Curated annotation (Swiss-Prot):
SUPFAM superfamilies: a domain/subunit of cytochrome bc1 complex (Ubiquinol-cytochrome c reductase), Transmembrane di-heme cytochromes. Binds 2 heme b groups non-covalently. A ubiquinone binds at residue 201. One of its GO terms (cellular component) is mitochondrial inner membrane. PROSITE patterns: CYTB_CTER, CYTB_NTER. This is Cytochrome b. Pfam families: Cytochrom_B_C (PF00032), Cytochrome_B (PF00033). The lineage of its organism: Eukaryota, Metazoa, Chordata, Craniata, Vertebrata. Belongs to the cytochrome b family.
């Protein structure tokens, strides 16, 4: 009798993806984040579904419906904070996952990488729209500021903004459509994750050495299933601690004030995971220039395969490039800090310098260093 795991049309796909998948024998804990992101997505969809059962997408009742979830629904506070902090965990893992890809040259899998960048955009859009739903002060003003950026598009800009708003300002129509999109996008993301994995399994995983690992591959199960479960336990521990001890640590106190179109908060800022891009946006005095810099700061990831000049794939044996990548990481931390600061001296100047160095490191210094390292190794 044939093995069902290997013969059943559906189970066979799962088998080739998670059980008998040939995996390099030397991949480190940096390869855990893919599975952790999958778990995060599942947590977000489940908690989001339960929140949607009690939430009302109407300007008059949205804020009080969230309060009702926290006060009156059984474990509603837990579901709400798991969803909010789950999003933060999602982005932490996303940034680690991308950082791993940059360090080990995983971006040379062009299809997988490009689908990943599109996934990043989709997750960012979903998170932004989700932040609008509680209809607090920061929800309302964040939505107003970010949607207004589209008015910088020549000729069609102002019309496009009013079309997205469904009126002449952020109002009931905006909230309703944001809820609809926020609900449907995670399912589109799930489908894209499957495409992401499909492309990855065409080539197989990269590994820390950046060398071909076809001669030394082991089955995914049980080796990496166990390793992933360890990562999962760490994730669940940290997420649980965050939810139960300081659930509002990463949130904004302004969002506990109901949205008021007549009262602008002194400092409008997005959630922490968008602050680096927000800092780049604010560092350019011109509106259109700022919007272009904002989009390009993420879109630049797609250029990495083209900018790769080194004859080695990974940075494991390239100390100068390693140093540059860590400088880039520090630069992003500085940008994140600046994004949360008021627009005044010296923060404006620091933000502008950090924005310039962000693009310079990626577009000029990294390719030059790769080329130079080839010369140093007489390649």
């Amino acid at each position: 009798m044939x093995n069902v795991r290997k013969s059943h049309p559906l189970i066979k796909i799962i088998n080739h993806s998670f059980i008998d998948l040939p995996t390099p024998s030397n991949i480190s804990a940096w390869w855990n984040f893919g599975s952790l992101l999958g778990v995060c997505l599942v947590i977000q969809i489940i908690t989001g579904l339960f929140l949607a059962m009690h939430y009302t997408a109407d300007t008059t009742t949205a804020f009080s419906s969230v309060a009702h979830i926290c006060r009156d629904v059984n474990y509603g506070w837990l579901i709400r904070y798991a969803h909010a902090n789950g999003a933060s965990m999602f982005f932490i893992f996303l940034y680690f996952h991308i950082g791993r890809g940059l360090y080990y040259g995983s971006y040379t899998f062009m299809e997988t990488w490009n689908v990943g960048v599109i996934l990043l955009f989709a997750v960012m859009a979903t998170a932004f729209m989700g932040y609008v739903l509680p209809w607090g002060q920061m929800s309302f003003w964040g939505a107003t500021v970010i949607t207004n950026l589209l008015s910088a598009i020549p000729y069609i800009g102002p019309t496009l903004v009013e079309w997205i708003w469904g009126g002449f300002s952020v109002d009931k129509a905006t909230l309703t459509r944001f809820f609809a999109f926020h609900f449907v996008l995670p399912f589109i993301i799930t489908a894209m994750v499957m495409i992401h994995l499909l492309f990855l399994h065409e080539t197989g995983s990269n590994n820390p050495s950046g060398l071909n690992s076809n001669s030394d591959x082991i089955p995914f199960h049980p080796y990496y299933t166990i390793k992933d479960i360890l990562g999962l336990l760490f994730m669940l521990l940290s997420l649980t601690m965050l939810i139960l001890f300081s659930p509002d640590l990463l949130g904004d106190p302004d969002n506990y004030t109901p949205a008021n179109p007549l009262n602008t908060p002194p400092h409008i800022k997005p959630e922490w995971y968008f602050l680096f891009a927000y800092a780049i946006l604010r560092s350019i005095p011109n509106k259109l220039g700022g919007v272009l810099a904002l989009v390009f700061s993420i879109l630049i990831l797609m250029l990495f395969p083209v900018l790769h000049m080194s004859k080695q794939r990974s940075m494991t044996f390239r100390p100068i490039s390693q140093c540059l990548l860590w400088i880039l990481t520090a630069n992003l931390v500085i940008l994140t800090w600046i994004g949360g600061q008021p627009v005044e001296y010296p923060f404006i100047t620091i933000g502008q310098l950090a924005s310039i160095s962000y693009f310079c490191i990626i577009l000029i210094l990294m390719p030059t260093t790769g080329f130079m390292e080839n010369k140093l190794l007489k390649w």
